[in-house]
Amino acid sequence: MSPAIALAFLPLVVTLLVRYRHHFRLLVRTVLLRGFRDCLSGLRIEERAFSYVLTHALPGDPGHILTTLDHWSSCCEYLSHMGPVKGQILMRLVEEKAPACVLELGTYCGYSTLLIARALPPGSRLLTVERDSRTAAVAEKVIRLAGFDEQMVELIAGSSEEVIPRLRAQHQLNRADLVLLAHRPRYYLRDLQLLEAHALLPHGATVLADHVLFPGAPRFLQYTKSCGRYRCRLHHTSLPDFPAIKDGIAQLTYTGPG
């Protein structure tokens, strides 16, 4: 490419960098810096975060553990977790619905799991599913450190596609009053349809889906709005520490056969 052509594209490149500077910062923190630290330490970011929690958080205090994870993400390494703003929305909805049984798809570091567990009424049960066994091991430690036992919070390591069909037979889950989709948005539609096919959503069940605007779940949103089985609402938010990057939590109420 000649210098003249390169100079012709320079204003466009500068414009894109300015317009998407927040996305560029996010890319640097979640991909470049994270990959470098993974190689340097031999540990994943969730494992490094848990080491920080062990030395800074109060065992048996889920609120303090959540605050410690927020501090780690803001001041040390970006964790790509739900964060306090979305967390308040999630806790409020869990408290309002008072579900007897909750299913979470995508445990990650256990952050949203703690949010749900501390908002549940006595006697409720939470099943949380994490595809990656190494990440699940970290989340298990976080959950137990917070003081939640296996009777209240059960962590299942495995892909949601394989776990959902086995929930009734192997985990005694006959219905999920509230479901949180917090794994990969491209799997949201598949897993929602699996929940429908296996009759795990009772009439009036609440389905919450994170990250429906960024990175986005357009097919999932289109399906829930057009299939006639859900009432839909969108809670507009943003990414933790990146207020300029808009995101949202979809709140669905199941009105189909249950």
Swiss-Prot record:
<dbReference type="GO" id="GO:0005783">
    <property type="term" value="C:endoplasmic reticulum"/>
</dbReference>
<dbReference type="GO" id="GO:0042424">
    <property type="term" value="P:catecholamine catabolic process"/>
</dbReference>
<dbReference type="Pfam" id="PF01596">
    <property type="entry name" value="Methyltransf_3"/>
</dbReference>
<dbReference type="GO" id="GO:0032259">
    <property type="term" value="P:methylation"/>
</dbReference>
<feature type="binding site">
    <location>
        <position position="160"/>
    </location>
    <ligand>
        <name>S-adenosyl-L-methionine</name>
    </ligand>
</feature>
<feature type="binding site">
    <location>
        <position position="130"/>
    </location>
    <ligand>
        <name>S-adenosyl-L-methionine</name>
    </ligand>
</feature>
<dbReference type="GO" id="GO:1904591">
    <property type="term" value="P:positive regulation of protein import"/>
</dbReference>
<comment type="subunit">
    <text>Interacts with LHFPL5, PCDH15, TMC1, TMC2 and TMIE. The interaction of TOMT with TMC1 and TMC2 is required for the transportation of TMC1/2 into the stereocilia of hair cells. Interacts directly with TMC1.</text>
</comment>
<keyword id="KW-0209">Deafness</keyword>
<dbReference type="GO" id="GO:0007605">
    <property type="term" value="P:sensory perception of sound"/>
</dbReference>
<keyword id="KW-1009">Hearing</keyword>
<dbReference type="InterPro" id="IPR029063">
    <property type="entry name" value="SAM-dependent_MTases_sf"/>
</dbReference>
<dbReference type="InterPro" id="IPR002935">
    <property type="entry name" value="SAM_O-MeTrfase"/>
</dbReference>
<keyword id="KW-0489">Methyltransferase</keyword>
<protein>
    <recommendedName>
        <fullName>Transmembrane O-methyltransferase homolog</fullName>
        <ecNumber>2.1.1.6</ecNumber>
    </recommendedName>
</protein>
<keyword id="KW-0531">Neurotransmitter degradation</keyword>
<dbReference type="GO" id="GO:0016206">
    <property type="term" value="F:catechol O-methyltransferase activity"/>
</dbReference>
<feature type="binding site">
    <location>
        <position position="112"/>
    </location>
    <ligand>
        <name>S-adenosyl-L-methionine</name>
    </ligand>
</feature>
<keyword id="KW-0963">Cytoplasm</keyword>
<keyword id="KW-0808">Transferase</keyword>
<comment type="function">
    <text>Catalyzes the O-methylation, and thereby the inactivation, of catecholamine neurotransmitters and catechol hormones. Required for auditory function. Component of the cochlear hair cell's mechanotransduction (MET) machinery. Involved in the assembly of the asymmetric tip-link MET complex. Required for transportation of TMC1 and TMC2 proteins into the mechanically sensitive stereocilia of the hair cells. The function in MET is independent of the enzymatic activity.</text>
</comment>
<dbReference type="GO" id="GO:0060117">
    <property type="term" value="P:auditory receptor cell development"/>
</dbReference>
<keyword id="KW-0128">Catecholamine metabolism</keyword>
<comment type="similarity">
    <text>Belongs to the class I-like SAM-binding methyltransferase superfamily. Cation-dependent O-methyltransferase family.</text>
</comment>
<feature type="binding site">
    <location>
        <position position="104"/>
    </location>
    <ligand>
        <name>S-adenosyl-L-methionine</name>
    </ligand>
</feature>
<dbReference type="GO" id="GO:0045177">
    <property type="term" value="C:apical part of cell"/>
</dbReference>
<feature type="binding site">
    <location>
        <begin position="106"/>
        <end position="107"/>
    </location>
    <ligand>
        <name>S-adenosyl-L-methionine</name>
    </ligand>
</feature>
<keyword id="KW-0949">S-adenosyl-L-methionine</keyword>
<dbReference type="GO" id="GO:0005737">
    <property type="term" value="C:cytoplasm"/>
</dbReference>
<keyword id="KW-0256">Endoplasmic reticulum</keyword>
